[in-house]
Amino acid sequence: MSVPADTSPAKGPVIAVVGPSGVGKDSLMSGLAVADPRLRSMRRVITRAPEAGGEDYQPVSEAEFQALVEADVFALHWNAHGLRYGIPRDIEKLREGATGVLVNLSRAVLLQAQEVFDDFRVISVTARPEVLAARLAGRGREDAAEVERRLARASLALPEGLRQVHEVDNSGALSAAIVEAQAIIQAERA
C-alpha cells in the first residue's frame, strides 16, 4: 500500500527580529518583505496609543488586551517597557506556504517563543551606539531619560539556549542589512 504524497503547503519558520530600540528592526522587516513577497510579517498587538507612530501594530486598551488573553487569542504574550505585547495565533496561517514569518520580539521572550513555535530562528539586529542614539533622538517617541535607559539596555545579551541565532549589523545603509539578512534566510532554507 502506498502512502499518498503530502500536498499540504510547507510552513515557513517564525523568524524573530530582535535588537535594541532604534536599531531599525521594522525598517529591516519591511525591506525584507518587499524583496520576497512570500516572506510575511506578523503585526503585534500592543497596549500603546494608536497615535504613537513607529511600527505597524494593532493598538488595544489594557482591558481589550486582557480579554484577548482570556480568550486564548495569543500564541505568545509578554510585558515590556510598561506595555503589553501579543502575537496572535493567526501567525500559524501566515506560515503556510511562506518563506518565513517575520515578527518583532523582545529579547526576554525568545526562549518562550522557541518552545511555542516548531521552527524558530532569530535575527539579532545590531548598530553602533552612536547610531542608536541618533535614531532614538530622531524619532521623538521617548524623552531624554528614556533614550538613556534604552541605550543602556542595548548591549544586553540574548538569552542562552537559543538554537538558531544570526547577527545583522544595521549601522550603515539599510540596503546592506537587507542583503545580509536575505542571505541568512536563504542559507537557512537550503
Swiss-Prot record:
The transmembrane segments are none
SUPFAM superfamilies according to UniProt: P-loop containing nucleoside triphosphate hydrolases
Which GO molecular function, any one, fits this protein according to its record?
ribose 1,5-bisphosphate phosphokinase activity
Which PROSITE patterns has this protein been placed in?
GUANYLATE_KINASE_2
* GO biological-process terms attached to the record: 5-phosphoribose 1-diphosphate biosynthetic process; organic phosphonate metabolic process
Disulfide-bonded cysteines: none
InterPro entries, per this entry? GK/Ca_channel_bsu, Guanylate_kin-like_dom, P-loop_NTPase, PhnN
Q: State which pathway it belongs to.
A: Metabolic intermediate biosynthesis; 5-phospho-alpha-D-ribose 1-diphosphate biosynthesis; 5-phospho-alpha-D-ribose 1-diphosphate from D-ribose 5-phosphate (route II): step 3/3
List the catalysed reactions: alpha-D-ribose 1,5-bisphosphate + ATP = 5-phospho-alpha-D-ribose 1-diphosphate + ADP
Q: Name one GO cellular component term.
A: cytosol
Q: Which residues bind ATP?
A: 19-26
Which EC numbers does the record give?
Answer: 2.7.4.23
Q: Which domain of life is it from?
A: Bacteria
Keywords in UniProt for this one?
A: ATP-binding, Nucleotide-binding, Plasmid, Transferase
Q: What does this protein do?
A: Catalyzes the phosphorylation of ribose 1,5-bisphosphate to 5-phospho-D-ribosyl alpha-1-diphosphate (PRPP).
Q: What's the family?
A: Belongs to the ribose 1,5-bisphosphokinase family.
Checking NCBIfam families in the record gives: phosphon_PhnN
Put simply, this protein is called: Ribose 1,5-bisphosphate phosphokinase PhnN
